[in-house]
Amino acid sequence: MGIGAGESCDPYKTFPIREHHEQVLRDLIARDKNHPCIVMWSMGNEPDTEHFPESAYDYWHSLYEFTHRLDPQNRPVTFVCCQNNYEKDIVTRTMDVVCLNRYYGWYNLSGDLEAASYAWNLELDFWEKQNKPVMITEYGADAVAGIHECVPEMFSEEVTNWEQL
C-alpha cells in the first residue's frame, strides 16, 4: 500500500467525530422535536459510504438507531447521498427514506443526455426494488458567469435559464 491508501485513510476510523455527531443530533432533536415542520431527521449530507462500506455502515446505521431512540415521535431518519455508486452503497438503503443528490448529464455522463437518462432510470429501478420512499433532494446544472452560446451548451448561462424551458 502506498501513502494515502488503505485502512489508515478510512475516515470512519481516522477522525474522532462520533461523540460530537451524537451531541449535535441530541441538540437538534431536543430543540426541534415539537416543531410542526419537522417530518424527518437528516443525520448528514453527502457522506462517503462507497469507499469504506463496512465502516460507513457501522457508523451511520448505529447513528440511525441512536436518532430513532432520541425522537419520541419516531419520525423517519435519513441522510442525503450524493454520487455514490448505489450498488456498492450498503448504507443508504437502510435509511427510512432514500434521499439523493443527483446530477446525471452534468457531473456524470456530462452532456450525454441520452446516456444520462438511461443511467438515471437504471438507478431509479434499483431504488424501487428497495421498497423505500425516494426523495430527489438536489438536481440541476451549473454555469460559468459570462459564457454565452446561441444554443444552450454545457457551462453557458443559457443552459440554466429556466425561463426558456
Q: Over which residues does each language-model region extend?
A:
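Conserved active-site aspartate in kinases
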Residues: 138
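Active-site mouth of glycoside hydrolases
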Residues: 1-109, 115-133, 143-165
